Design a protein with these regions (language model features):
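N-terminal low-complexity, intrinsically disordered segments
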Residues: 1-71
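Short beta-strand-to-loop capping motifs
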Residues: 14-21, 80-84, 121-124, 191-196
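A common structural junction motif
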Residues: 34-40, 96-107, 213-216
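Mixed-charge, glycine-accented linear interaction segment located at domain edges/termini
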Residues: 167-222
Length: 222
């Protein structure tokens, strides 16, 4: 009987990127409104210029509970980062709602895409490296590579993406699964999921650990 693998979220982010020429939120207003809504605001490294001058910001901007607000004004990106797949969608929706209702900026009206980036750890029942070497559908391929290199060879990881798609497309995902370099009985997994449709990204985030677990279970059977 196969033991269902335990999937742990190490880090996950959820962000919106807009098509605006300039970042659509005034940083001064954003700091004030977030503070009123219980966010801890990161101190500025330089003073804010007088209005209406545009202010560039990058990286850690504020924090509330377990999530950090990240901002990239050059890329028109606003997002959250933390370690809870289960709660990040709700926290992200709260952040967007604050922007729309209290700053009167409708980010969704000019959205370019939404994106989630996650890193995960998965406990293996035996050596993760060994399990890649046992993938029967890859044995012939591995043998051909061995013949080229004249060195015993096996897979060290797998990467999945949409069929016939390229990474510079808006509708995109990639899932990397590979042995944890420091813990041989664990898999590591990195995921990027991007779409113009928020529902698609939210659905992925809500199911991420279950889907990753299913991928690992399929590998056990191959």
């Amino acid at each position: 009987m196969l033991t269902s693998p335990l999937v742990v979220t190490y880090n996950i982010s959820l962000a919106i990127v807009t098509n605006d020429v300039f970042f659509p939120i005034d940083i001064r207003d954003f700091r004030e409104v977030l503070a009123k809504n219980g966010y801890q605001i990161e101190p500025l490294t330089k003073s804010l210029p007088p209005r209406p001058a545009h202010f560039q910001a990058s990286g850690y901007f504020a924090r509330k509970n377990e999530f950090v607000v990240n901002i990239e004004t050059i890329n028109n990106q606003l997002g959250l980062e933390g370690s809870s797949s289960e709660r990040i969608v709700e926290a992200f929706n709260e952040l967007i709602d604050i922007v729309e209702k209290q700053i009167q900026v409708n980010l969704k009206s000019n959205v370019k895409f939404y994106e989630s980036i996650g890193s995960y750890g998965i406990q293996a029942t035996e050596s993760a490296i060994k399990q890649f070497g046992l993938l029967t559908n890859m044995i012939i391929f591995n043998q051909k590579i061995e013949n080229i290199l004249s060195i015993p060879t096996q897979l060290f990881g797998l990467k999945f993406c949409p069929k016939n798609a390229m990474p510079n497309q808006i509708e995109w995902f990639n899932i990397d699964v590979y042995p944890d370099v420091l813990q041989p009985n664990k898999f590591a997994c990195n995921v990027v999921f991007r779409s113009k449709e928020k529902d698609k990204v939210d659905k992925w985030v809500s199911q991420d650990k279950e889907l990753i677990k299913n991928i690992i279970e399929v590998m056990k059977l191959e």
